[in-house]
Curated annotation (Swiss-Prot):
The gene is Cysltr1. GO terms for molecular function: cysteinyl leukotriene receptor activity; G protein-coupled peptide receptor activity; leukotriene receptor activity. Residues 52-59, 130-143, 217-232, 300-339 are cytoplasmic. Belongs to the G-protein coupled receptor 1 family. Keywords: Cell membrane, Disulfide bond, G-protein coupled receptor, Glycoprotein, Membrane, Receptor, Transducer, Transmembrane, Transmembrane helix. This is Cysteinyl leukotriene receptor 1. InterPro entries: CLT1_recept, Cyst_leuk_rcpt, GPCR_Rhodpsn, GPCR_Rhodpsn_7TM. It is a multi-pass membrane protein. The keyword Transmembrane applies. It comes from Rattus norvegicus (Rat). Disulfide bonds join C98-C175.
Length: 339
């Protein structure tokens, strides 16, 4: 949420002289650096492979491409956060980029949740109701769903654009800091409950229901021959659920506890410091979903592994035959036949 990185700081200055500034700066700069590198190269590679094998059209490919784009848009702003925390909370990039960097993190967070939920729902439909709803799981419908998710998240996340930069008492420009006035704090609390219900609880329940139905359906078909497909589906369920629990659940639970903690009358210095550290850890975990998503692509029922194999063969083939310019036309024709 707005200023989640340092939310407790302004509430503890009058009572607690200790701070977690050093801990915060070290953890955020380290975690965001790692997420930037791993997330950028992982999602760039996945996106490149998916685009290169776009002739293998499927609804799940559409969701995976959009998920990779959301991750890349986020990781491109994380280096700005790294610079901010390396310089001990000094912002050098202007008010617009301050707002945009905050906004990008939460757009990615909730786009990832909704794309994963949509993938889970349509996979459930494909496995549990393969005949009755065969026209529901199509690439065209997947595009409409993705456009709807982007529009919904972009609009509903717009309040995060209100998180502007400002000058502190030492004339340093600050960003990602907590709201100061009571009215804004109440607004943040309302925003939290809306995002908690619609951005986490409903999607999480949907995923659990879908995966329960998938598992029950697969268990009923244990005597059938498609054992490899069943193993791939269960593997995907485990990875998606684990990523959801590790990245999103700790952040939303901690945020709920944190906001109520801020409104309590009695807060010891130790409890304030512990709460501040929990903010740092859970927000870092939430941002790390950019690194987990490439694993989701890999475990999406073997589809991505097949694409990767196809991509590798095409790449090796092109490298082998590039010098033979006279043979380029028949080779291209052969590839078209294979596709």
């Amino acid at each position: 949420m707005v200023g989640a990185e340092n939310m407790t700081a302004s509430f503890s200055n009058n009572r607690c002289h200790d701070t977690i500034d050093e801990f915060r700066n070290q953890v955020y700069s380290t975690m965001y650096s790692m997420i930037s590198v791993v997330g950028f190269f992982g999602n760039s590679f996945v996106l490149y492979v998916l685009i290169k094998t776009y002739h293998e059209k499927s609804a799940f490919q559409v969701y995976m491409i959009n998920l990779a784009i959301a991750d890349l848009l986020c990781v491109c702003t994380l280096p700005l956060r790294v610079v901010y925390y390396v310089h001990k909370g000094k912002w050098f990039f202007g008010d617009f980029l301050c707002r945009l960097t905050t906004y990008a993190l939460y757009v990615n967070l909730y786009c990832s949740i909704f794309f994963m939920t949509a993938m889970s729902f349509f996979r459930c439909v494909a496995i549990v109701f393969p005949v009755q709803n065969i026209n529901l799981v199509t690439q065209k419908k997947a595009r409409f769903v993705c456009v709807g998710i982007w529009i919904f998240v972009i609009l509903t996340s717009s309040p995060f654009l209100l998180s502007k930069s400002y000058q502190d008492e030492k004339n340093n420009t600050k960003c990602f800091e907590p709201p100061q006035d009571k009215q804004t704090k109440k607004y943040v609390l309302v925003l939290h409950y809306v995002s908690l219900i619609f951005g986490f609880i409903i999607p999480f329940v949907t995923i659990i229901v879908c995966y329960t139905m998938i598992i029950l359906t697969l268990l009923k078909n244990t005597m059938k021959k498609n054992l490899p497909s069943r193993r791939k589906a269960i593997g995907m369920i485990i990875v998606v659920t684990a990523a959801f629990l590790v990245s999103f659940m700790p952040y939303h639970i901690q945020r709920a506890i944190h906001l109520h903690f801020l409104h309590s009358e009695t807060r010891s210095c130790d409890s304030v410091l512990r709460m501040q550290k929990s903010v740092v850890i859970t927000l870092s975990l939430a941002a790390s979903n950019c690194c987990f998503d490439p694993l989701l692509y890999f475990f999406s029922g073997g589809n991505f592994r097949r694409r990767l194999s196809t991509f590798r063969k095409h790449s090796l083939s092109s490298m082998t035959y590039i010098p033979k310019k006279k043979a380029s036309l028949p080779e291209k024709g052969e590839e078209m036949c294979k596709e």
